[in-house]
């Protein structure tokens, strides 16, 4: 006579937490598997699906040093002086859209060093 799943579940539910931990360790050794690895593998694809690949850099405010921010905006966008000044003065405004995470973070860092308040979406 073999043991059913229900009988196993009943037996495990009657065990103390320490007994369950010992049971799991024994099963990992017996079958050469790790319970943590199975959880990580199951969670892996979900995280990959949620990861965003394109980011927008939004200038929230120019800050106290507007001239330095205008220079940073010109360098990042290739705009002329007047266009960059108008963009900075019209904050909040999108500086770049659909760029990689690394590029967005680098742009954010350079603008923040110039004194701007920046958001990456």
Swiss-Prot record:
Keywords carried by this UniProt record: Ribonucleoprotein, Ribosomal protein
CC annotations in GO: cytosolic large ribosomal subunit
Highest taxon listed in the record's lineage: Bacteria
Biological processes, Gene Ontology terms: translation
Disulfide feature: none
Pfam families per the UniProt record, alphabetical: Ribosomal_L12, Ribosomal_L12_N
Molecular function as annotated in GO: mRNA binding; structural constituent of ribosome
InterPro entries reported in the protein's UniProt record: Ribosomal_bL12 (IPR000206), Ribosomal_bL12_C (IPR013823), Ribosomal_bL12_C/ClpS-like (IPR014719), Ribosomal_bL12_oligo (IPR008932), Ribosomal_bL12_oligo_N_sf (IPR036235)
Oligomer status and interactors: Homodimer. Part of the ribosomal stalk of the 50S ribosomal subunit. Forms a multimeric L10(L12)X complex, where L10 forms an elongated spine to which 2 to 4 L12 dimers bind in a sequential fashion. Binds GTP-bound translation factors.
HAMAP family: Ribosomal_bL12 (MF_00368)
Family note: Belongs to the bacterial ribosomal protein bL12 family.
Known role: Forms part of the ribosomal stalk which helps the ribosome interact with GTP-bound translation factors. Is thus essential for accurate translation.
Name of this protein: Large ribosomal subunit protein bL12
Organism: Klebsiella pneumoniae subsp. pneumoniae (strain ATCC 700721 / MGH 78578)
Lineage of origin: Bacteria, Pseudomonadati, Pseudomonadota, Gammaproteobacteria, Enterobacterales
């Amino acid at each position: 006579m073999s043991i059913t799943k229900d009988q196993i579940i009943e037996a495990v539910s009657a065990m103390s937490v320490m007994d369950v931990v010992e049971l799991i360790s024994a099963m990992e050794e017996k079958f050469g598997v790790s319970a943590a690895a199975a959880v990580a593998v199951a969670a892996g694809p979900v995280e990959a699906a949620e990861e965003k690949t394109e980011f927008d850099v939004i200038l929230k405010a120019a800050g106290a040093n507007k001239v330095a921010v205008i220079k940073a905006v010109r360098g990042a966008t290739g705009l002329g002086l007047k266009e960059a000044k108008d963009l900075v003065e019209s904050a909040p405004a999108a500086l770049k859209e659909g760029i990689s995470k690394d590029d967005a973070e680098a742009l954010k860092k350079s603008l923040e060093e110039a004194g701007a308040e920046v958001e990456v979406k």
